[in-house]
Regions:
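Core catalytic alpha/beta fold that binds nucleotide/phospho-ligands
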Residues: 1-159
Length: 159
């Protein structure tokens, strides 16, 4: 996935390769020549998601599929409003990638009156359903995630 991140960042003019030697907090990959650029990478069988930001960011994408009962129980949360299981899953994963904190089984997200309520005041999170067959989420503590995802053609990534 580092190649995907490098390809997308190169296509966007950043031209830097990420390093995965643990120099960033929690061993997270980073761009040594451009430390002010933050990114988060996720993939599933059918999609890859790379979030690039001027502030720390967490992103996750999951392919929607039937849930085993044990997984459904793991995702259960008493007060999550109308969040669907994969929305909750991707939000929790993206939050964990952003902060490195919390228990993936219990990170508290909910939707109240149509508004996403993240686990920490001031956090900015968004759920995306525009990747066919997938759900994605992005979380930040400083920048509002974009309203829509920007799709990058594979030929721009793999050249």
């Amino acid at each position: 996935m580092g190649r995907v991140a490098a390809g997308i960042c190169g296509a966007r003019g950043l031209g830097h390769r990420p390093a995965g030697d643990g120099g960033a907090a929690g061993g997270k990959p980073y761009f040594p020549a451009c430390p002010q650029v933050h990114f988060s990478v996720s993939h599933t069988r059918t999609a890859a998601l790379v979030a690039v930001s001027a502030a720390p960011v967490g992103a996750d994408v999951e392919q929607v599929r039937p849930l085993y009962p044990a997984m459904a129980r793991r995702l259960a949360q008493a007060d999550c409003g109308d969040l669907q299981p994969f929305e909750l899953w991707t939000l929790r994963e993206s939050w964990f990638k952003l902060t490195g904190a919390g228990d993936l089984r219990t990170i508290p997200f909910r939707r109240a009156d149509g508004v996403l309520v993240p686990p920490e005041a001031g956090a900015l999170c968004r759920v995306y359903g525009d990747i066919p067959g997938c759900v994605a989420a992005v979380c930040s503590l400083a920048e509002q995630p974009p309203e829509r995802l920007q799709f990058v053609p594979p030929r721009e990534i793999c050249t």
